[in-house]
Structures are given as C-alpha cells and as structure tokens.
Amino acid sequence: SVTAAPQEDEIPRADGDDAAATDTSALIWYRYGDEPMLAAERRTVSRLPNEPYETALLRLLLEGPSLDAPALRGLFPAGTRVISTSRQGEMLFVTLSYQLMNGYSDEPSNWRSDTAWAQEVPLRRRLAMQAIAATVTENTTAQQVVILLEQRGETTDSLRLRQKYYTLNAADDALADPLRRDESLLLTASGTMRTILTCIQQRDIRRLYRYLAQSDPDTGEARMEYEAFASKWTEYPALTAFDFSGGSASGTRAVFTVSGTRLADGVSQKFTCLLYTSPSPRDGATSR
C-alpha cells in the first residue's frame, strides 16, 4: 500500500543507552525484483533493551524482506551484520561487518567478462547503499549516512568505506562519500508512476508487465498472462510525451492526473486521464 513518510514527531528516538525495548512500524527499502529500483515494505522493528533504534532498523534491512513480500529481494552478501550505529547531529555513522565486501553467492567468477553481470554487480552495491540511506532517512531525522567497515588486522588510516566497494577496483582507496537519499532509485508513488509511463513510452512491454498487479485490487481478477498482454498491447496508440501531477494518497492507492500526447493511426492526439499506483510488496509496485 502507499504509506506516507512518518512525521518528525512520530519518528522513534533512541539516542540514549537506557531506551526500553519496544516494537515500532517502519518502511524498509529492498530491491524490487531484478529492477534497478527499490520498493518499501512496512515491517515491525523489534528493538532490544538498550539497542539504538537505528541499529534495529538496519538489522531488519540486512535480514532481507519478509515472506509476505515475494516481489522484493535482499541486497547484502550473506553474513553481513550491523555492528554499531552512532548519531552525530543529522549524520548517522554505521559500522558494518567485513562480509559487506564479499561477493554475492550467485556471482560468476568471470562476471567482468559477462556484459549483463558487469552491469549487475556494481548495481547491486549501489542499491545496497541506497537501501541504507533510504531506510534511515525514511524513519529517522538523519540526513546523511557514513558507512564504516569492520577491520580484520589491516593497517588503515580510516574505517570509512572506500570507493573500491563501488568500482570493484582493489587499488581505489579513495573514501566513499556519505550516503544521501536518491529519489530516482525509489519506487515511491510518483517514482512508480514515472517508471511505468516511461516503460509505456519506450514500448518496453516486458518491463512494464513486471509492474502490473498480480490481481485487480477491486475485482480480484488475476493478471493476464504475458503473451496475451504483449499481444493486446500492439493495439494501443504510442505514447509520445507525458507529464503527471498529484499523487494524493487514499487508502491503498495514489491518484495522479496524467496528460500528454499519443500517436494513433499517424495522428497526434492530446489526452488527460486519471491513473493510480498501488505499491504493494505482495504484488509488486502496481498500476492501473
């Protein structure tokens, strides 16, 4: 469902070590399928006595999405742990275990020579860090996140994460920049609408299909098979330009006013219509 970000006075605070154990609700950002995007799942964050809220929040992120969200995927190598978190004003310092630098279990050894994997491997690392930034900024007042890395006997002048995490170049020892929220990677209500309209404009039918609901939320009718969907799509006019506004949330949907031009039988036509997105980890980020 579309869920508004928490207001500042609703954000749990855990700056002291004497905080009591508590359960709170939070939006945790995970990868949406194989897409280069993140989608949020609302989860219950169980905080242990004296555990900072930010630590519990990121622990849940690293564990991966729940079984109720089959469309979402975790982003961190096996064994990666949150060792500690510390707030300094609007900056959150996060220390992660050394496993962060490990490869993923499904990465082929020759990934650099494979065109698809050569794009996928760096993308995973970028999305993993953005998942941290998005989850932290969504649920706390922190604006930036600095990642520190557990050291295992190495001699170094800083615990800061290095650029080689992103570039996968062992010689790239420059310090990584603090993480900031990047809305272009997030399937918020507006982000989902923009992605879907872009798919329509580019006639990327296979990708568009991944953003359709598994079933109609109003009627319960199941999504048609891809072959039928792709065949039917050839009947529709081409979308040549679009813009949208609104995004007011109501219940389980966010409604947008979409305008633009479409090309039908060689004739350009202007149009305006209402569309809505209904991001749901059960069905994926969806649109009608």
Protein language model features and the residues they cover:
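Bimodal "functional hotspot" detector
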Residues: 1-282, 288
